Amino acid sequence: MPLGLIGEKVGMTRVLLKDGTAIPVTVIKFPVNYVVQVKSQNTKDGYNALQIGAYEAKEKHLTKPLIGHFKKHGVPLLRRLWEFRVDNPEEFQSGQQLKVEDVFKPGDLVDVWGISKGRGFAGAMKRWDFAGFPKSHGHRYHRAVGAIGQRTDPGRVWKGKRMPGHYGAKPVRVQGLFVVDVLPEENAILVKGSVPGHNKGIVVVEQSTIAYRKSQKLKQKRYQFIIENLAKEESQEVAES
């Protein structure tokens, strides 16, 4: 079962290999992550999991049940909580601090969850990638949705019909991203490619749930050359900037 951390998307940049090849990466930094609660099959919870928290909060911004929950487990008041299913909960305890090197290493595949950038109200072509109508031949429906209804039966628009509406600002998870480097001094990682959300947005990074797939193992093997040829001083400068 995957373990992960709560962090912040710093932004995108690139790192250089020894031969000058540029690799696009996203920098993700992590604050102190606390193990808030350990759940086990042997307790009333009935399953194995870790509740992880990050980003300290003021008491006035939390409910009394949450404040009591944090005090019970001996951790600071926290703004963000996330639960990860694990196989070995007995190896952790409430109040324990998790660092980036405890969870990730270069060459890992990770899944990243975040809130996508909001783009406001958008039409069906932008929001759902509809092809649109022909460009000419005497009509005025170039970017229109087209027919949305049914016949007498059922006589309504199906729930979930793809139509114009608010685009973005939704939870998105990108799977199988390659960890290019881990920077313990900065408590940060560099992942190949982009991750959801805007800069300074909260993201959750966990060990990939699809790493067992043959296609992912081949990708992991194919990208090993990045780690072998990475100019370490380059990645360190990226994180510090």
Swiss-Prot record:
Domain of life: Bacteria
Keywords, alphabetical: Ribonucleoprotein, Ribosomal protein, RNA-binding, rRNA-binding
GO molecular function, one term: structural constituent of ribosome
Keyword set includes RNA-binding: yes
CC annotations in GO: cytosolic large ribosomal subunit
Gene3D superfamilies: 3.30.160.810, Translation factors (2.40.30.10)
Entry keyword Metal-binding: no
Biological function: One of the primary rRNA binding proteins, it binds directly near the 3'-end of the 23S rRNA, where it nucleates assembly of the 50S subunit.
Protein family: Belongs to the universal ribosomal protein uL3 family.
Oligomeric form and interacting partners: Part of the 50S ribosomal subunit. Forms a cluster with proteins L14 and L19.
Protein name: Large ribosomal subunit protein uL3
Native species: Aquifex aeolicus (strain VF5)
